[in-house]
Amino acid sequence: LHPRVRRQRQMCIRDRYRWTLWRLQPALGICKRTSRGACTDGRQMNIYKLDNIKLSPTSDERELVKIAARALGHKPLYFRILKKSLDARKKQDIHWVFSIEYGDEFPPVCAPLEKLRSHRKVYVVGSGPAGLLCAVRLADRGFTPIVVERGERVDDRAESVQKFFGGGELDENSNVQFGEGGAGTFSDGKLNTQTHSGFNAEVYRTFVRFGAPEDTLYLNKPHIGSDVLKNVVKNMREYIISCGGQVRFGTLFSGFASRGGKLFAVRLKTLDNGFETEEAADDLVIATGHSARDTFAMLTESGIAAEAREFAVGVRIEHAQDCINRAQYGNVKGLPAADYKAVSTVSDRRVFTFCMCPVSYTHLTLPTNSRV
């Protein structure tokens, strides 16, 4: 070991729970710091973090454990990848960049959320990502949410969509935009976002909890994949039901009733037979996405305030994948399909690339027969 590394490791041995700043650039080309937490018995513990670890495209990720072991002096009991991204700025030095966390003890585990055991009837309209995540959190807290979805279960919905792509008729209530899983079900389950929110990590953890790949937690541009996403969505639905909730498909939210400004009922329409019922409700969450125009019209006509949201108008640009790979990677092989990001300002307005879909298809997506 580099003498500086050896000395600083000895400092930790002498005072295991000391707040220490490590600098390992001379030895490993990386920076390291510790974060301190508390064990359940009140002892202090150190969890170490290594940033800016560079590995070649052909390296095995198990090399990261060896790097942690060298810094710690022995194989760590706890190890986790925090972040993984590809640095292709220099064609002669393309490499993966990692951040890892490790230690001799596992970090403290957050206590489960308290079960409130509420008897309030909560309706969630829509089973896209917003609706499902909302219902899962409600179930976690002891509620028994009722999810209302006009479309079909994800497997039945996939069949309807494939029939439409093959020239069949459009089902206006179950298509690329309506149905279990939301519109993202057929766009490879990409989870990259330009919104910097503290809730992003919790969303990723929830997806992994229900079956998404573990690398969703640390990839720079994570995506679940449409096939895996279908199972994740089904697992969420089964969990909601196991907690006493309901998920009703083929059911349209057609209205609500209030008294003195307070909600007391929702009106639901069964699409198979057109039968409409009114059910008592204490709370209502609208998670319909952006395509349920009839729902938005009903809400505004009922006096619910609404305001237009800014949106971007986009065009599709197609490139040969080999051209993008050569531009980004040069002649380096064995890397994932390359993408890029471009931003400019035209007449004081931003123009930017947003969604990269290597080896993708363009399909007409329309919620009704009269509108694209």
Question: What function would you assign to each model-found segment?
Answer:
Residues 1-15, 363-372:
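Single conserved hydrophobic/aromatic residue that forms the stacking wall/gate
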